[in-house]
From Swiss-Prot:
Polar residues bias spans: 436-448
Function noted in UniProt: Probable RNase involved in rRNA stability through maturation and/or degradation of precursor rRNAs. Binds to RNA in loop regions with AU-rich sequences.
InterPro entries documented for this protein: DUF402, FomD-like_sf, Ntdp-like, RNA-bd_FAU-1
EC category: hydrolase
Source taxonomy: Archaea, Thermoproteota, Thermoprotei, Thermoproteales, Thermoproteaceae
Protein's recorded name: Probable ribonuclease FAU-1
PANTHER family assigned to the protein according to its UniProt record, in alphabetical order: PTHR39159, UPF0374 PROTEIN YGAC
Record-stated family: Belongs to the FAU-1 family.
Length: 448
């Protein structure tokens, strides 16, 4: 069975589930060892699961079979949003340069080549994917060979580097090894992965020799479009509020866990959350309402993991809606509304406690209403971080009151990332955000 290394705020819940699904847990933290009574195993993982930057999900990376199996079991349990890269990290292929800074990868997809590399249009060479394509973003490939193993990575950069998870004391041992037993490989290009700190010199030397033989074989090339070596599969997994509640249940089977634990952990709560768990206090709604005061950051998370942050000040809290005032940077035009963003233009954002939408209404510096933008998303999570997953379709209303549906084609393009329950998003029409909350009447001005 596959070996999994799991880190982050979802570690206990996902470790419990992974064990149920037959995974072996490797390189566990001491806390996970204690909670599950595990025997420490420091062998390299087949899959690594770690926090996404938004703390509203995880990133999975590893051998494709292990990643696919983990995603399928996770899909069955929590029904999350899943975006899997269409190419692997360190896929090695024969690419044809088709334009300035672009190379054609297997399947015809185009990837960007960093400007520091000089490539001639029409030429072919061996390329390695260093940033896989995700959602609307192109991948990045370089005219280098990268051959990654469990412990090491051989490459053609001519440098020796180390995972940031290897401490300086351990780096000293590996640096000496790179200058002696691995000297020939280090002169080509060598990177020590985090698992290298647990490996013996003989294990490292054996893998380096195997990777070198594979690199020689790859360097012989092939016809354009050939995939010479499969890299690691990567996927972004995002949890909405419903999915987080399911993960709360999984964690509760191991240690005391209140409803809303993972949502609150994503707000940055530490020891005080441990206390609430121990006391068994059902305080999620009150806690997030308390946290949503003063300055907040709205995390607008795209299904493929892109995070757009909007900062503002809470001007009103009621039982069912939060009102945030956000200054806008001058310049440009409000999409779907047509009004110019002048100095002093601001938005009032209404965040309902339930309902799959957020309402952004826009005002001039003097408080004159300009129009409204309704974002359709998962149920928002309150707190000092207001978090939701964008479901890609939006509505806009100008001063004429005409409803304009935006980005419906984007939903169609990326619907496969969404679970079935989220593929037909709806939002009420005619909603406007004012300093007092949601209304359907056109305001003449606002003093917020």
């Amino acid at each position: 069975m596959f070996k999994a290394r799991i880190r982050g705020i979802y570690a206990t819940a996902l470790t419990k589930l992974a064990l149920d699904w037959g995974f072996e847990i490797v390189q566990p933290t001491q806390q996970i060892i204690n909670r599950f009574g595990l025997k420490p195993d420091y062998s390299p993982p087949d899959i690594t699961v770690k926090d996404h930057e938004s703390k509203t999900g995880v990133v999975t990376i590893g051998e494709c079979q292990a990643v696919d199996y983990f995603l399928e079991r996770l899909r069955q349990y929590v029904d999350p949003v899943i975006a899997k890269a269409s190419a692997g990290l360190h896929d090695v292929f024969i690419g044809r340069v088709v334009g300035e800074g672009l190379v054609e990868a297997p399947g015809g997809q185009l990837m960007e080549v960093p400007r520091r590399y000089v490539v001639q249009p029409g030429s072919t060479s061996v390329f390695t994917v260093v940033k896989p394509p995700m959602g609307p973003f192109r991948g990045v490939a370089v005219p280098e060979i990268v051959v990654e193993g469990k412990l090491l990575e051989l490459n053609t950069t001519g440098r020796v580097s180390y995972s940031r998870h290897i401490a300086e004391q351990e780096r000293l041992r590996l640096r000496i090894l790179a200058e002696t037993k691995l000297k020939n490989y280090a002169s080509i290009g060598l990177r020590f992965k985090s698992s290298a700190k647990y490996a013996s010199e003989d294990e490292l030397a054996k893998e380096a020799e195997e990777l070198y033989k594979e690199m020689l074989k790859i360097s012989q090339g092939g016809p354009p479009g050939t995939l010479l070596r499969r890299g690691k599969c990567i996927a972004v997994v995002l949890f909405d509020r419903q999915a987080k509640f399911k993960l709360d249940e999984a964690r509760a089977a191991v240690v005391p866990t209140i409803r809303g634990h993972h949502a609150l952990r994503g707000q940055g709560l530490g020891k005080c959350l441990d206390l609430l768990d121990y006391a068994g206090a059902d305080v999620y709604e009150k806690a997030v309402e308390f946290l949503a005061r003063g300055r907040v950051v709205i995390y607008h998370v795209k299904p493929w993991g892109e995070v757009i942050k909007m900062r503002g000040e809470v001007v009103k809290i009621s039982d069912d809606v939060l009102v945030v005032k956000r200054p806008l940077r001058p310049g440009g035009v409000l999409d779907g509304i047509g009004a110019k963003i002048e100095p002093g233009t601001y938005a009032l954002t209404c965040v309902p406690k339930s309902g799959g939408y957020v309402v952004h209404s826009y005002y001039s510096a003097s408080g004159v209403y300009l129009g409204t933008y309704v974002n359709i998303n998962t149920d928002p999570e309150w707190g000092r971080r207001i978090i939701y997953i964008d479901l890609l379709v939006d509505k806009a209303y100008g001063l004429d009151g005409v409803e304009r549906v935006l980005d419906a084609d984007e939903l169609q393009r990326y619907a496969h990332m969404l679970p079935e329950r989220l593929r037909r998003p709806e939002a009420p029409g005619g909603k406007i955000c004012t300093s007092e909350g949601l209304t359907s009447a056109l305001p003449q001005s606002s003093s917020a």
